[in-house]
Amino acid sequence: MDLVSIILISIGLSMDAFAVSITNGAMISKVTASEGIRIGLFFGGFQALMPLIGWSIGIKFESYIAALDHWIALILLSIIGGKMIYDSIKENRDNKDEIACDYAVGEKKCLNNKTLTLLAIATSIDALAIGVSFAFLKVSIINTIIIIGSITFVICFIGVMIGKKCGKLLKKRAEILGGIVLIFIGIKIFIEHTNILSKIF
């Protein structure tokens, strides 16, 4: 897998965390740079950890399903991407937003570490599934999780900072964009591994 694909996957995966970061930034009473860094570190850390766990699981079964690697990548990325798009257009907010709201408003003026951990886990489950597909692709897992974690950190920091001004609108668009990116990468991997275009043309 090339660097551009890894970066695009990182951006796509980070959109869920970005959306929650915007929600937090829009609702906590005082948004500061240090708060943005703290939130970014939590989300970025878990977003890097989950693919590593998924990769570790997938590598154990590589010999059994290596012939299906492109199908696994396509299916996982498409399901996750489709779910992100579906969730973003639902009328009701999902559980991640409800957790964020519960702790970000009222008497709670900022997010505590326990809440951030729950949010970070909730938004990185998709990355766990993607990590499984990494086991069947030619990627350097260490470099990949560093890129994923770093990009998520930066994007979440930005999300917190701008959440006050355009939280609701940008949150919805971010999830849709993230879903589209993941589906696109899934199709790209499938085409590359099957050489389907060369067979057609």
From Swiss-Prot:
Primary role:
Probably functions as a manganese efflux pump.
Q: Does the keyword Manganese apply?
A: yes
Provide the disulphide bond pattern.
Answer: none
> What cellular component GO annotations does this protein have?
plasma membrane
* Localization, UniProt: Cell membrane
GO molecular function terms here?
A: manganese ion transmembrane transporter activity
Quote the protein name from its UniProt record: Putative manganese efflux pump MntP
| UniProt membrane topology term | Multi-pass membrane protein
Query: Which superkingdom?
Result: Bacteria
Membrane spanning stretches: 3-23, 39-59, 65-85, 116-136, 141-161, 176-196
Q: Which family does it belong to?
A: Belongs to the MntP (TC 9.B.29) family.
This protein's record includes keyword Transmembrane: yes
Q: What is the gene name? A: mntP
Using the UniProt record, give the first listed, main subcellular location: membrane
| Matching InterPro entries | Mntp/YtaF, Put_MntP
| Keyword terms of this UniProt record | Cell membrane, Ion transport, Manganese, Membrane, Transmembrane, Transmembrane helix, Transport
**Which classification does the entry list for the species?**
Bacteria, Bacillati, Bacillota, Clostridia, Eubacteriales
